[in-house]
From Swiss-Prot:
GO biological process per UniProt: proton motive force-driven plasma membrane ATP synthesis
Record field: transmembrane: 47-67, 104-124, 157-177, 199-219, 237-257, 258-278
Organism (species): Psychrobacter sp. (strain PRwf-1)
Name of the featured protein: ATP synthase subunit a
Single GO term (MF): proton-transporting ATP synthase activity, rotational mechanism
UniProt function note: Key component of the proton channel; it plays a direct role in the translocation of protons across the membrane.
């Protein structure tokens, strides 16, 4: 594939999603080029990201369900032992970092950690295998293979990472209102960090406090999602650049980078999970 097109085309092809959306003048369709995908705008759907994220979510649920169903009280098998270690690891972090009373946080944290880890893990797949297979399938169906895009790492798509982070943001708002009441939540946004005993001064400070607190609040999901996206996108881009090099250089660079990347994909899943726990813990605290 790399020999048939330019390096620029190769990189652009690997960084373009399989996109379905409304193209002005042509109606609803699958994008044939990166330019068409961009012109489809915000409402376009990245079909590959949806397919892989949902598919890996099903794999996660099925795997844990099967292990739980076959779990024994005696000496556990290797898979059961690994699952138990993950569950205990997440549960320990929740107990140490979450000060609220909700029983939802531990299973939520476990879901976030394992799901993101599985999505990140796709970055270790050989860069061309699945996309080239998708191109061959597309060609067999009568499509131009160069117009077939198929990314396999959902966390390199900001729509996925920001979608997860804003779901966490919705939980932050929910727990803030649940624990503090609507009045307490509004007061937290308008009466801090600056306060005054004089009623007039307090009213004057309300918009200033709101701007500062709102920026702090909205920065949480944005930074949470973009941090995961940025790290994974950069990792994928490096793999793409390595794939453009001569074969003997590819092995010399890809193996150590893949080994190092194992740390990155695990760390990014852990960071997302921990920040979620911390944010929800702060939202559950009744004192500012």
């Amino acid at each position: 594939m790399a020999a048939e097109i330019t390096s620029t085309d190769y990189i652009a092809h690997h960084l373009t999603n399989w996109t379905y959306g409304y193209l002005p003048g042509e109606g609803w369709k699958v994008a044939h080029t990166a330019k068409e995908a961009g012109e489809m705008g915000f409402m376009a759907i990245h079909l590959d990201s949806m397919l892989w994220s949902i598919g890996l979510g099903i794999v996660f649920c099925a795997l844990f369900w099967l292990v739980a169903k076959k779990a024994t009280a005696g000496v556990p098998g290797k898979l059961q032992a690994a699952i138990e270690m993950i569950v205990e690891f997440v549960d320990t972090n929740v107990r140490d970092s979450y000060n609220g009373t909700s029983k939802l946080i531990a299973p939520l944290a476990l879901t976030i950690f394992v799901w993101i880890f599985l999505m990140n893990l796709m970055d270790l797949m050989p860069i061309d295998y699945i996309p080239v297979l998708a191109q061959k399938v597309g060609a067999a169906m009568g499509h131009d293979p160069h117009h077939v895009f198929f990314k396999i790492v959902p966390t390199t798509d900001p729509n996925i990472t920001l979608g997860m982070s804003f779901s966490v943001f919705a939980l932050i708002i929910y727990y803030s209102i649940k624990e503090k009441g609507l009045g307490g939540f509004v007061g937290e946004l308008t009466l801090h960090p600056f306060s005054a005993k004089n009623p007039i001064a307090k009213i004057i400070l309300i918009p200033i406090n709101f701007i500062l607190e709102f920026v702090t609040l909205i920065a949480k999901p944005i930074s949470l999602g973009l941090r995961l996206f940025g790290n994974m996108y950069a990792g994928e881009l490096i793999f793409v650049l390595i794939a453009l090099m001569p074969f003997w250089i590819q092995w010399a660079l890809s193996v150590p980078w893949a080994i190092f990347h194992i740390l990155i994909i695990t760390l990014q899943a852990f960071v997302f999970m921990m920040l979620t726990i911390v944010y929800l813990s702060l939202a559950s605290q009744t004192e500012h």
